Amino acid sequence: MGSTLKHLLLLLLVLIRHVDSAAIVKSLPGLEGRLPFELETGYIGIGEEEDIQLFYYFIKSENNPKEDPLLLWLDGGPGCSSLGGLLFENGPVALKSAVYNGSNPSLFSTTYSWTKMANIIYLDQPVGSGFSYSRTPIGKSSDTSEVKRIHEFLQKWLSKHPQFFSNPFYVTGDSYSGMIVPALVQEISKGNYICCKHLINLQGYVLGNPITYAEHEKNYRIPFSHGMSLISDELYESLKRNCKGNYENVDPRNTKCVRLVEEYHKCTDKINTQHILIPDCDKKGHGITSPDCYYYLYFLIECWANNERVREALHVTKGTKGQWQRCNWTIPYDNNIISSVPYHMDNSINGYRSLIYSGDHDITMPFQATQAWIKSLNYSIVDDWRPWMINDQIAGYTRTYSNKMTFATVKGGGHTAEYLPNESSIMFQRWISGQPL
């Protein structure tokens, strides 16, 4: 009898270990009343033993969830939680910037959410970011391993939500996800050819200020800085003449170039590289004490996500996560995709649509760098450079290519959509519905 009971308990433990959790969230601390949208959170187990547990937030479209596109949103980093994308960039709720007094930070409903026209899965990846965790040590993650894990996540998530198999599917994200998203699109596309009875209805992808070939793209920071009047004409001409376009991995024997690059950094070190017009108040922690700093919101999101009531509302499994961080920079990680340009080329050949947008006040990933790799794909222009408008005002500039790739700048935007979420939302809404920007 004792042996039978022991075996039953072991079987129960195995079943519990392999059950993926999902729960509907009716309300959130900091927001009054019931949620005006449908939110589901949960974990999907990854790997043979499903030791990796990837946490997600799923928000149904507020328009027509049965037919509207399904998006997967990935934040950058690597190691940044997609809760940041939800609360800062394109979700239906956002954090109020107010002095933290020890109580839970407040939320408000937004008018710019992408969920007004799409279903969105916000995924915490790689494992170790956000509320995702592993039951056992997994060693170092990498770009390529994460691509396979995210693909597995999608297959399992859709098998549990089969009503979304037929929805047009897009992979979306910004910043470092520029390395992951194109490779993931290729992985899904290949998977559709070799498997299964239910195919992912892959249509394309969306990327904002994407890192694509980091070591090469950094060289565009100096031309960008000159164009924005952060350095003088004389310094710029000397840099071009003596560095020959290579400003990052400078040969130490080229002493003239070394000295000139040092002069450049003296001019720009106190500039906020994410958005050159916003005070760089986060590096010394000034934002922690004053909501006058834009990045005070980064402090507030950590206060909110580490509140026990919030974790209970989100159905985070107790004991699986210590301190929640907006970005976990300590995850062991191998950046083993050197350039995602070949993936863009492959995805273009396979006919997938893409929207690539750039906030034009971002030094981290200058729009000139993005234009350069798009040009290197060597596709013809079908709709040449022109302004795109909102309420008869120029919101940015756009160009469309024969590979179904649309490039757009967001005038006054920064490294992510959070700086101008309304403009970014209108741009996305037009593109996803097939309208010209």
UniProtKB/Swiss-Prot annotation:
Superkingdom, according to UniProt? Eukaryota
S-S pairs: 80-327, 243-257, 281-293
After gene disruption, what is the outcome?
Answer: Lack of sinapoylated anthocyanins.
Residues that carry a glycan: 101, 328, 378, 422
Q: What EC class does the entry list?
A: transferase
UniProt-annotated location(s): Secreted
Q: Specify where it is mainly localized.
A: secreted
An example molecular function term from Gene Ontology annotations = acyltransferase activity
Question: What does UniProt give as GO cellular component?
Answer: extracellular region
Biological process (GO), any one: proteolysis
In terms of Pfam families, this protein maps to: Peptidase_S10
| Listed Gene3D superfamilies | alpha/beta hydrolase
Q: Any signal peptide, and if so, which residues?
A: 1-21
Q: What are the EC numbers?
A: 2.3.1.-
Sorted alphabetically, which keywords does the UniProt record give? Acyltransferase, Disulfide bond, Glycoprotein, Secreted, Signal, Transferase
Kindly state the tissue distribution recorded for this protein: Expressed in senescent leaves.
Active site residues according to the UniProt entry: 175, 362, 415
Coiled-coil blocks: none
Q: Which family does it belong to?
A: Belongs to the peptidase S10 family.
Per its database record, what is this protein's job?
Involved in the biosynthesis of sinapoylated anthocyanins.
Q: What else is known?
A: In cv. Pna-10, this protein SCP10 and the adjacent SCP8 are not present due to a natural 13-kb deletion.
Protein name (database record): Serine carboxypeptidase-like 10
* Source species: Arabidopsis thaliana
Q: What is the lineage of its organism?
A: Eukaryota, Viridiplantae, Streptophyta, Embryophyta, Tracheophyta
